[in-house]
Amino acid sequence: MFEVVIGLEVHTQLNTKTKIFCSCATSFGEAPNTNVCPTCLALPGALPVLNEEAVKKAIAFGKAVNAAINKKSVFNRKNYFYPDLPKAYQISQFDIPIVEKGELFINVKGENKRIGITRAHLEEDAGKNIHENNFSKVDLNRAGTPLLEIVSEPELRSSDEAVAYLKKLHSIIRFLDISDANMQEGSFRCDANVSIRPKGDTKLYTRVEIKNLNSFRFIQKAIEYEVKRQSEAWEDGTYEQEVVQETRLFDTTNLVTRSMRGKEEAAEYRYFPDPDLLPVLLKDEFLDIKIPELPDEKKARFIDELGIKESDAEVLISSLEMSRFFESLISQNLNPKLCVNWLNTELMGLLKGELTIENSPVDAQKLGVLIKRIEDGTISAKAAKDVLAFVFENTSVEIDEAIEKLGLKQVSDDSAIEAVIEQILNANANKVAEYKSGKDKLFGFFVGQTMKEGKGAFNPAKVNEILKTKLG
């Protein structure tokens, strides 16, 4: 039997307005080579100037994962040649990163596990190579975008643990609001280092790096395939020939990894301190940066203070947008448990395809009005579902307008309800006698008949209250 050893390197693009060493915009989707200047094009004489906001965001991350923040950190030149790297070196941090020795906790199959974070360092992103119609093009809009590279300890033991770690990391980054962490746009990318060893062995065997995985599903599939490939090679006696230190790409069509190139060692990059950048020396005020409430803290508060079930709280902290939506709801002085039900079950049940909580046709204010109308007895919970579906499709219609249009307003007028109840009791004198002799289940019959006569418009609470008075 084998033990899997996985370490992950995550590159997340920091959401600064400008690049890390120049004033070019970092906006995504611009025309190729428009967000560029002499610095990110590496023209002679152009000098880098460090973006203070990128430093603050790195510190915020360090605090969120209980890491050590180095008061002194150094930028190095990482030398290699590639078309999308104009300088032929990348400015990164090597010996002294800004963040070291952090941790986060994951839960897999009911078990909590601590995963160490070796380091998190600042660096610049490269440009983008585009290969089409027998031509290769280079777009340098992305060159110089600030990255935070987060390196885990090799303490993950399965693809499930790897995905749990990444989801937790992704959530922390989003709640800190230091990156949009959009995997489709490449602002949260993962490289996985995978190796195997016999159970009980502590030696680290040959590791394979799988590059640029940009979805949780593909990360899981890539790791599972690579573990299978290495395990089969070991069992076949071809491990030393088949498993070499290399970089592999994941084929998302066939769900296999393919060799890309040999894996470089650190010495091959010839790191040395960048002579154009002074060491970063942090004042104490930088270390006192306040960070927002993190997912685990928010979850605990929802459970302890609002009495929400753990499973529901998990859904509410599944994204920053989801938790913001919920908190906007409860800020309207509504019953938290009612809010959970209408958000997690009813509204989320309508969101399909490309619709998410971020672009929901029904915002928190509108859903809040609907919940208020349930609480004040204007409509029943059953009718509210029809109202929600209606305003979901007809976004310009307000809740009260929809209630009127659909004719779903409840009747709470005592005299109107009493008149109907009197008719039903007079028409069913025998059943009234049976009820009074001890057949309590007949109460449901009277409620049903009353609601039927009222065509579902009577307030159920009022119906129950009046019936109890009438029947004694």
Swiss-Prot record:
<keyword id="KW-0436">Ligase</keyword>
<dbReference type="InterPro" id="IPR004413">
    <property type="entry name" value="GatB"/>
</dbReference>
<dbReference type="GO" id="GO:0006412">
    <property type="term" value="P:translation"/>
</dbReference>
<comment type="function">
    <text>Allows the formation of correctly charged Asn-tRNA(Asn) or Gln-tRNA(Gln) through the transamidation of misacylated Asp-tRNA(Asn) or Glu-tRNA(Gln) in organisms which lack either or both of asparaginyl-tRNA or glutaminyl-tRNA synthetases. The reaction takes place in the presence of glutamine and ATP through an activated phospho-Asp-tRNA(Asn) or phospho-Glu-tRNA(Gln).</text>
</comment>
<dbReference type="InterPro" id="IPR023168">
    <property type="entry name" value="GatB_Yqey_C_2"/>
</dbReference>
<dbReference type="Pfam" id="PF02934">
    <property type="entry name" value="GatB_N"/>
</dbReference>
<dbReference type="InterPro" id="IPR017959">
    <property type="entry name" value="Asn/Gln-tRNA_amidoTrfase_suB/E"/>
</dbReference>
<comment type="subunit">
    <text>Heterotrimer of A, B and C subunits.</text>
</comment>
<keyword id="KW-0648">Protein biosynthesis</keyword>
<dbReference type="InterPro" id="IPR003789">
    <property type="entry name" value="Asn/Gln_tRNA_amidoTrase-B-like"/>
</dbReference>
<dbReference type="InterPro" id="IPR006075">
    <property type="entry name" value="Asn/Gln-tRNA_Trfase_suB/E_cat"/>
</dbReference>
<dbReference type="InterPro" id="IPR014746">
    <property type="entry name" value="Gln_synth/guanido_kin_cat_dom"/>
</dbReference>
<dbReference type="GO" id="GO:0050566">
    <property type="term" value="F:asparaginyl-tRNA synthase (glutamine-hydrolyzing) activity"/>
</dbReference>
<dbReference type="GO" id="GO:0050567">
    <property type="term" value="F:glutaminyl-tRNA synthase (glutamine-hydrolyzing) activity"/>
</dbReference>
<dbReference type="GO" id="GO:0070681">
    <property type="term" value="P:glutaminyl-tRNAGln biosynthesis via transamidation"/>
</dbReference>
<keyword id="KW-0547">Nucleotide-binding</keyword>
<dbReference type="InterPro" id="IPR042114">
    <property type="entry name" value="GatB_C_1"/>
</dbReference>
<protein>
    <recommendedName>
        <fullName>Aspartyl/glutamyl-tRNA(Asn/Gln) amidotransferase subunit B</fullName>
        <ecNumber>6.3.5.-</ecNumber>
    </recommendedName>
</protein>
<dbReference type="Pfam" id="PF02637">
    <property type="entry name" value="GatB_Yqey"/>
</dbReference>
<keyword id="KW-0067">ATP-binding</keyword>
<dbReference type="InterPro" id="IPR017958">
    <property type="entry name" value="Gln-tRNA_amidoTrfase_suB_CS"/>
</dbReference>
<comment type="similarity">
    <text>Belongs to the GatB/GatE family. GatB subfamily.</text>
</comment>
<dbReference type="GO" id="GO:0005524">
    <property type="term" value="F:ATP binding"/>
</dbReference>
<dbReference type="InterPro" id="IPR018027">
    <property type="entry name" value="Asn/Gln_amidotransferase"/>
</dbReference>
